[in-house]
């Protein structure tokens, strides 16, 4: 199945000159969604993670079923103020400003093997910040999985030297 055919391209969104890669058309396609989760599972089995960490919010969409298929726990990485217990927090730079991500301090025991998933790898900022959260938790990053990778933005080069899976490349 050619997953790229299930991604809708919206020109000039969210601003002029940008082509937005819309995954909602993939999500609404039953066969495409099943195939996406199945191929992610197949490719991520070798990582042998203890946990799948999904980045808010679209990382949750793919992370939960992947964790289920891998028979491991799921850990949400959230925007600030969304988690009720003690958190590790990391700030990171955006094109115009800063943002932060958080994870519960007791979400995963030190030494756990962690796989990070998100829908899209662009500049690597969000995935890089998630890496810092995993380091604060004293866990071991075993790999990244992305549905889409925007190669021209060079995000892969900014991430730790662990395996990186992307199903669709632009």
UniProtKB/Swiss-Prot annotation:
Coiled coil: none annotated. SUPFAM superfamilies: PRTase-like. It catalyses: AMP + diphosphate = 5-phospho-alpha-D-ribose 1-diphosphate + adenine. Pathway: Purine metabolism; AMP biosynthesis via salvage pathway; AMP from adenine: step 1/1. It holds the Pfam family Pribosyltran. Its EC number is 2.4.2.7. One of its GO terms (molecular function) is adenine phosphoribosyltransferase activity. The keyword GTP-binding does not apply. It is found in: Cytoplasm. Gene3D superfamilies: 3.40.50.2020. One of its GO terms (biological process) is adenine salvage. Its main location: cytoplasm. Keywords: Cytoplasm, Glycosyltransferase, Purine salvage, Transferase. PROSITE patterns: PUR_PYR_PR_TRANSFER. GO terms for cellular component: cytoplasm. Catalyzes a salvage reaction resulting in the formation of AMP, that is energically less costly than de novo synthesis. Belongs to the purine/pyrimidine phosphoribosyltransferase family. Homodimer. NCBIfam families: apt, PRK02304.1-3, PRK02304.1-5. This is Adenine phosphoribosyltransferase. It comes from Trichodesmium erythraeum (strain IMS101). The gene is apt.
């Amino acid at each position: 199945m050619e997953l790229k055919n299930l991604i809708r391209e919206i020109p000039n969104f969210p601003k002029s000159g940008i082509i937005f890669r819309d995954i909602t058309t993939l999500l609404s396609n039953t066969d495409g969604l099943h195939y996406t989760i199945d191929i992610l599972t197949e490719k991520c089995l070798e990582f042998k993670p203890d946990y799948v960490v999904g980045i808010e919010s679209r990382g949750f969409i793919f992370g939960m079923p992947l964790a289920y298929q891998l028979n491991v726990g799921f850990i949400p990485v959230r925007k600030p103020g969304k988690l009720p217990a003690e958190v590790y927090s990391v700030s990171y730079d955006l094109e115009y400003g800063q943002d932060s991500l958080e994870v519960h301090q007791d979400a995963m025991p030190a030494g756990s093997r962690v796989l990070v998933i998100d829908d899209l790898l662009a500049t690597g900022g969000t995935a890089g910040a998630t890496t810092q959260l995993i380091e604060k938790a004293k866990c071991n990053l075993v790999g990244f999985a992305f549905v889409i990778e925007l190669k021209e933005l060079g995000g892969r080069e900014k991430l730790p030297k662990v395996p990186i899976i992307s199903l669709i490349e632009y």
